[in-house]
């Protein structure tokens, strides 16, 4: 299962980890991701050069196998290095040299069911994805993902440059959402989205005078559903939201089916 979220960070100007946190740093040591299981709930936070860019934010999936949003502990973690080069056409950069540090964190429930979260941290970017691990002694080989707990909880001073998601089967020839709605620059986070459906990726945030963060999904193929961000919730931030059931004229499911 691959559902990758990208948090790209740029800092203008200059956090320690809790004792139980598992940390991974960028190659230059400035970008730090701290992963924890506080209260049985998986989460992470991001700082850059000592400045908090993302407060503790939720991780996890609700599936037909188990609820991987609570009742979890960190079972193990492994860190490795990534250093690869590749070329790509039709982009602004044709030759890419990607270096990052990777952290695999396995969360476990009391009954032994496990979820792995893989973080890749380069000098300016954080990406993560989920993997549901095989269940020993069971016949589970696939799962339905009902929803994600994945959230982005920015500091309170953050303002937004984000496009509201509009309802399905509206607009010209009932083609919306077409991801072309107007947005307000530098808007406060606690203002409801214009249509009550959250916001469309990519989403740009300004963390006061400390820097900027761009949030988007990437690496999503036909094996998973596209998503967007929910409206802001105090203390939780923005949560990953699945498609509206009315999209695509009601055909198909708004959930995701994945292999285990």
Named regions from a protein language model:
Residues 21-260:
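N-terminal accessory beta-strand-rich subdomains and adjacent acidic, glycine-rich linkers
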Residues 9-17:
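Hydrophobic h-region of N-terminal signal peptides that target proteins for export
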Residues 1-4:
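Positively charged n-region of N-terminal signal peptides that target proteins for export
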């Amino acid at each position: 299962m691959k559902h990758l979220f990208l948090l790209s960070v740029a800092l203008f100007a200059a956090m320690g980890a809790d004792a139980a946190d598992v940390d991974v740093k960028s190659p230059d040591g400035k970008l730090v991701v701290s992963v924890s299981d506080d209260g049985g709930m998986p989460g992470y936070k991001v700082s850059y050069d000592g400045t908090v860019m993302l407060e503790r934010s939720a991780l996890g999936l609700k599936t037909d196998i188990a609820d991987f949003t609570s009742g979890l502990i960190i079972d193990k973690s492994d860190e490795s290095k990534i250093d690869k080069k590749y070329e790509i056409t039709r982009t602004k950069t044709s030759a890419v040299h990607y270096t990052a540090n990777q952290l695999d964190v396995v969360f476990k429930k009391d009954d032994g069911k496990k979820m792995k979260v893989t973080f890749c941290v380069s000098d300016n970017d954080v990406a993560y994805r989920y993997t549901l691990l095989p269940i020993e002694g069971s016949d589970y080989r696939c799962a339905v993902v009902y929803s994600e707990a994945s959230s982005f909880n920015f500091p309170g001073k953050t303002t937004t440059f984000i496009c509201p998601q509009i309802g399905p089967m509206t607009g010209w020839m009932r083609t919306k959402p077409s991801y072309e709605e107007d947005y307000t620059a530098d808007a406060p986070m606690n203002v409801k989205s214009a249509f009550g459906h959250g916001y469309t990726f990519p989403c740009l945030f300004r963390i006061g005078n400390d820097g900027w963060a761009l949030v988007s999904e990437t690496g999503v193929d036909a094996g998973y559903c596209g998503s967007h961000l929910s409206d802001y919730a105090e203390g939780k931030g923005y949560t990953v939201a699945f498609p509206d059931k009315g999209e695509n004229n009601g055909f198909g499911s708004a959930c995701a089916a994945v292999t285990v």
